[in-house]
């Protein structure tokens, strides 16, 4: 296994451990992921450094999900399906972000720089879908971006807590985004 692949696996395990044990010390986190405290200390010397490293890594992975989803090239519905599946493939990082993101992180230039372009890419995708008539135009592209993120994070968290099964989450998320919860198509009132 390459060093990068080993670091990737360690980061994912640490992200999950930090969600499962939010107040754990570095020593407790090391034990939870099966490495020595010295190994974890060489990787990150403080908990704050670990959070920053995980935030930056999560941003890189999430931005790669956008590229892998082929948002510009694939047909819009297929791209949406790809986007959901790509995000679900990295559910440990999604949950880590959900539990560890704080509004003051937007003041940290290094973290925000790593996220540069993420929302804008999603906004552009939803705008393309609106122009093609796939997505509603009475909801802004920015709002659709926020809805996508909310649906994915809430479904991943519900699975983590045992409320819903993993099977079918992608389909549920896609159907919610495309059709909402209405049993019938909306009619003009």
Language-model regions: role of each:
Residues 18-23, 41-52:
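HTH DNA-binding helix-turn interface
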Residues 33-34, 45:
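Central "turn" residue of the DNA-binding helix-turn-helix
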Residues 38:
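Key DNA-contact positions within bacterial/archaeal DNA-binding proteins
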Residues 53, 64-92:
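Hydrophobic alpha-helical connector segments
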Residues 99, 112, 131-175, 186-189:
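Hydrophobic/aromatic-rich alpha-helical bundle segments in the mid-to-C-terminal region
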């Amino acid at each position: 296994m390459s060093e990068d692949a080993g670091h990737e696996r360690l980061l994912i395990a640490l992200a999950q451990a930090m969600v499962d044990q939010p107040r754990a010390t570095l020593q407790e986190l090391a034990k939870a992921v099966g490495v020595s405290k010295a190994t974890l200390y060489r990787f990150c010397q403080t908990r704050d450094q670990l959070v920053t490293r995980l935030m930056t890594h999560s941003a890189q992975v999430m931005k790669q999900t956008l590229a892998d989803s082929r948002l510009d090239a694939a047909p819009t519905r297929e791209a949406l399906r790809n986007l959901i599946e790509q995000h679900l493939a990295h559910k440990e990082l999604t949950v880590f972000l959900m539990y560890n993101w704080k509004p003051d992180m937007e003041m940290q230039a290094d973290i925000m720089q790593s996220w540069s372009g993420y929302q804008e890419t999603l906004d552009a995708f939803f705008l393309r879908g609106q122009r093609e008539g796939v997505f509603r135009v009475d909801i802004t592209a920015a709002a659709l971006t926020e809805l996508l993120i909310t649906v994915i994070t809430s479904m991943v968290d519900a699975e983590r807590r045992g409320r819903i099964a993993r099977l079918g989450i992608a389909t549920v998320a896609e159907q919610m985004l495309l059709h909402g919860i209405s049993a019938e198509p909306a009619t003009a009132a």
